[in-house]
From Swiss-Prot:
PANTHER family: DEHYDRODOLICHYL DIPHOSPHATE SYNTHASE 2, DEHYDRODOLICHYL DIPHOSPHATE SYNTHASE FAMILY MEMBER
A GO molecular function held by the record: ditrans,polycis-undecaprenyl-diphosphate synthase [(2E,6E)-farnesyl-diphosphate specific] activity
Record text on cofactor binding: Binds 2 magnesium ions per subunit.
Active site positions: D21, N69 (proton acceptor)
HAMAP family hit by this protein: ISPT (MF_01139)
InterPro entries, alphabetized: UPP_synth-like, UPP_synth-like_CS, UPP_synth-like_sf
Matching SUPFAM superfamilies: Undecaprenyl diphosphate synthase (SSF64005)
Protein's UniProt name: Ditrans,polycis-undecaprenyl-diphosphate synthase ((2E,6E)-farnesyl-diphosphate specific)
Length: 251
């Protein structure tokens, strides 16, 4: 990742979420092992971080490893864990150089203790950075996220600190893994698939969806800028009519 340059203000989402799909297919197309696609995908991560930071996006959430990905071949899962561990150690310095804070969301209990320690260390080492938040979803699933939020609230009710009727969508949202961050405005999926695959199910309620046919390793600077330009061209109505939105913009 290069030293990130500043850019002027532009019409961009506060929070971008990305499903990084197509690493294996990228590798197969080149007659390479699947892990080669995941390694190549790291360059795309760096490129997207650079574009988002330049454009003044506040939060970038990357779907790195879903709770369903444990079902993949053991060799691939092992290679992904090793790559994740290496990237945490290697990229932390670059994140600090660019004032980027790292957060990791998901159920960490299945990860090796050494990897869990590396996650905590990277988060602590970047916690003082304030320019931009890079959030990695690892062993994450949207259904898991909603369930763990409901469990937290149920414990509060059980302890007598909360009444069932006190539970509102707003309160439940604060208990999600992303609770204190703005909701995603834009969700991008690469690889040509048109689904969200159990990613941020609650949080994506009003997000704009953008699908790219590019495999993730090929989704670099120009592709990310194109996605942001497409977002800027859309009118977000949130249930209102176009006339209401336009009138509100003029007010």
């Amino acid at each position: 990742m290069e030293k990130i340059k500043s850019a002027g203000p532009s019409s961009v989402p506060r929070h971008v979420a990305i499903i990084m799909d197509g690493n294996n297919r990228w590798a197969r197309k080149r007659l390479l092992p699947g892990v080669a696609g995941h390694k190549a995908g790291v360059d795309a991560v760096r490129a997207v971080i650079e574009v988002c930071a330049e454009a003044k996006v506040e939060v970038l959430t990357l779907f790195a490893f879903s709770s369903e990905n444990w079902q993949r071949p053991a060799e691939e899962v092992g290679a992904l864990m090793e790559l994740f561990f290496t990237a945490l150690r290697r990229e932390t310095k670059r994140l600090n150089e660019n004032d980027i804070s790292l957060r990791i969301i998901g159920d960490r209990s299945r990860f090796h203790p050494e990897l869990q320690a590396a996650m905590r260390e990277a988060e602590v080492r970047t916690s003082g950075n304030s320019r931009f938040v890079l959030q990695i979803a690892a062993n994450y699933g949207g259904q898991w996220d909603i369930a763990q939020a409901a469990q937290r609230l149920a414990r509060e009710v059980q302890a007598g600190h909360l009444q069932p009727e006190d539970i509102t969508p707003q309160l439940l949202q604060t208990c999600l893994a992303t609770g204190d961050l703005p909701l995603p405005d834009l969700c991008i999926r690469t690889g040509g698939e048109h689904r969200i695959s159990n990613f941020l199910l609650w949080q994506l309620a009003y997000a704009e969806l953008y699908f790219s046919d590019l495999f993730w390793p090929d989704f670099k600077h120009d592709a990310m800028r194109a996605a942001l330009a497409d977002f800027a061209s859309r009118q977000r109505r949130f249930g209102k009519t176009s006339e209401q939105v336009e009138a509100g913009a003029r007010a």
